[in-house]
Amino acid sequence: TYYGKVRQIIDSNKKYPLLSRQRKEEGAPKVIFTILKNGVVTNLSIISSGHRSLDREARRMILISSPFPKIPDSVNESSISLTIPINFRLKNN
């Protein structure tokens, strides 16, 4: 699906912030944005995780992922609005 491709691109650009790792910060900021028909992102906002570095990384992930692939013609919309949680979880060792 188009959503699956978008999610895969976003996830491929994820880097757990070093400072957050050191502080053992976890969270799930939500990114809210619109993808225009040509794949360009607009109206990007963040619902905070409570940790500034995680929120900044979530924003960076969207910006570096843009532009996304064009919205397929089969999707009869000029834009798609998405809300996606970005989960930052440290693995237990």
Question: Where are the regions that the model predicts?
Answer:
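Short amphipathic alpha-helical segments
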Residues: 1-2, 50, 54
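Short tight loops/turns at secondary-structure junctions
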Residues: 23-50, 62-65
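An alpha-helix initiation/capping motif
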Residues: 4, 25-29, 80
